[in-house]
């Protein structure tokens, strides 16, 4: 029978220039706490599934990281290509896949700017907080569109700002303002999802938020004495009817 993983895979090596540092292996406990706290009601995933369904389809997971989202995707998708360039993340990703028993996931050690898959090879591409940070990510956008079949979907999740936590990354929130027009120019719709970071204890909230954003975050948690914090993301979605290079 036709094997999607071997039919699409070209085996090109990853370029070091595409690697964003991955801190999960050095801070495993904090990384785990953050993953548990983020979007506990799964509102983000539900919105992604509604915009770009993956049930029975071939999915490209751009920036798979340690596989926290890859494994749930594999429960629905026909096959998942887990694209991850960071060497530190790859052992965790492979271990997570092995322990889950998922047989329909192919790890692709590469970045978004040079995806070693054939043209028109996947039905859907997801990217959650990876690579697509507005201006400058055009090369990766062209590559992802190349591997998505006509009629397929691309869904990109990024911070929206204008929420309780964005006060701690002022420069990033300013950068977020440039993203909606950048994506809109390239044919993307945008859906805002209101969700939360919900920790089990104040100590967990202190540990994670202080690690991420320092003393201002620590003071905020202590002053407000709670474990849940408002958070908004933007999901940029586009149906791939024609490639970006053909439109511009």
Task: Enumerate the language-model features and the residues they cover.
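A short SAM/SAH-binding and catalytic strip from SAM-dependent methyltransferases
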Residues: 123-138
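Conserved class I S-adenosyl-L-methionine
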Residues: 5, 9-55, 68, 153-182
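A short glycine-rich, Lys/Arg-flanked "PGG" loop and its adjoining helix->strand segment in the class I
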Residues: 138-150
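A short acidic, Gly/Pro-enriched loop at the edge of an enzyme's catalytic core
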Residues: 113-125
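Class I SAM-dependent methyltransferase SAM/SAH-binding core
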Residues: 60, 65-114
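Conserved Class I S-adenosyl-L-methionine
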Residues: 184, 189-248
């Amino acid at each position: 029978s036709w094997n999607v993983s071997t039919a699409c895979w070209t085996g090109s090596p990853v370029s070091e220039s595409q690697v964003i540092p991955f801190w999960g292996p050095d801070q495993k406990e904090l990384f785990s706490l953050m993953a548990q706290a983020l979007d506990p009601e799964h509102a983000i995933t539900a919105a992604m599934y509604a915009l770009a369904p993956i049930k029975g389809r071939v999915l490209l997971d751009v920036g798979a990281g340690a596989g926290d989202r890859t494994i749930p995707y594999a429960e629905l998708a026909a096959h998942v290509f887990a694209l991850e360039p960071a060497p530190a993340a790859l052992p965790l990703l492979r271990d997570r896949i092995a322990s889950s028993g998922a047989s329909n996931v192919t790890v692709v050690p590469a970045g978004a700017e040079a995806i070693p898959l054939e043209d028109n090879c996947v039905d859907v591409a997801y990217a959650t907080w990876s690579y697509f940070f507005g201006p400058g990510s055009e090369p990766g956008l062209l590559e992802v569109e190349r591997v998505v079949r006509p009629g397929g979907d691309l869904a990109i999740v990024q911070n929206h700002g204008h929420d309780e936590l964005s006060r701690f990354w002022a420069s990033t929130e300013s950068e977020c303002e440039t993203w909606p027009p950048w994506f809109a120019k390239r044919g993307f719709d945008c859906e805002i999802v209101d969700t939360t970071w919900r920790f089990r204890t104040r100590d967990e909230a202190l540990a994670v938020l202080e690690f991420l954003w320092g003393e201002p975050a620590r003071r905020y948690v202590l002053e407000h004495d709670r474990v849940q914090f408002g958070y908004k993301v933007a999901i940029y979605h586009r149906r791939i009817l024609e490639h970006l290079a053909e439109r511009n």
